[in-house]
């Protein structure tokens, strides 16, 4: 995995787990370990093992789980079209092998621990289509080049006063937002959300995830909690833990939260991804080499273009790769039908074109920071994105730019929504899926098995959507047609 050799406060090791398991009379005792595999939707799937069974057996042999976990849709419905696990194989087991670097107390359940796992075939070999494995393959490509990725995600969600059961009883419509109006950046009008949000923040901090900030966003009831950047795998694990924690703590509080990209006609939920590359020794690689007086040393190209000031050649090619691959990789950033409702919203901060800019929020690639903090912000992913696949896509696109020495076109200084000559993102999941399936770049970077597996997942999503009668159809046609 090439994860940095460090351990955050709040994480557990096996010796601590044994001690907590033995102290059965203590309120800090742990009696269960939840072993979770992130699925194609970025949800934790798996089983709870008694702590004794985990220590005595699961650590050595893993935990069996049905292979269909990586071949189902949002509804957990199986589909016959996956080469990975078709019906005629009988849907046998793979084994969930715990990644002990992720072991911690479950933030939503004080007597349980949780650990992330990788899927392995019984005969050996990691299941390549598992999202963690997809990201690991791209991290390995970085590692062979002497590189490592640091990442952070900014994930938004909506808070409602109703419970999940009440929301379901109302068909998830007509719900009461936890704030009555736009309180973006406001310190007024957020008290209705503060109780649940504070509980989530504290629980995540106790689980070893450093909280940097939290604030309300544009949509009524919308909030964003920002955690400190980390190595790319840890950030994606923390992202999934955050979503899982938020949903469980909301349910315990009798409330509901949603991370769906576009709940209604208001602002959608984004998941902006910040990413930079470092050397394996921690050296800064995105910033140009400084002169003795601290100014960045320009090369011939950056000396002629002010928009490139401070960016290393490696960073420029990395950003150019984002632009070159963005349309073909859109499926990794926007994996559902609903994703494209967010990206199609006029007048929102969700990008529609393929461009980059300096601190320009109308561009899908926003270059921010300076020196060691110089990084890209990828603004296409929504709250429904699988973080492992999104970050893997950003890395693969960047490596395509670096390996092919791509030149970076001029930055967009104005409104990228209306700028002439700006290519557009796919407008629908169908368009994105076709571009992904036919992408030679994707097949070279990820392998045919991964490309075909994710393309079929989009097929299943589209088949469900295209055969579902919606409220929109009934409202328009029931009486008037």
Located regions from the model:
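Short, hydrophobic beta-strand segments
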Residues: 115-121, 223-229, 275, 378
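Active-site-proximal beta-alpha loop/turn segments in soluble metabolic enzymes
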Residues: 177-188, 220-235, 264-270, 284-285, ...
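A generic structural motif
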Residues: 39-41, 120-126, 189, 229-235, ...
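ATP/Mg2+-dependent ligation/transfer catalytic cores
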Residues: 2-213, 235, 424-481
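Catalytic-core signal marking the mid-to-C-terminal active-site face
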Residues: 2-8, 15-20, 241, 248-249, ...
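Histidine-centered divalent-metal-coordination microenvironment in nucleic-acid enzymes
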Residues: 156-170, 216-228, 260-282
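Accessory "access/gating" subregions that flank catalytic or transport cores
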Residues: 188-193, 197-212, 225-232, 243-259, ...
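Short glycine/proline-enriched loop/turn "hinge" motifs that connect secondary-structure elements
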Residues: 104-111, 149-150, 214-219, 266, ...
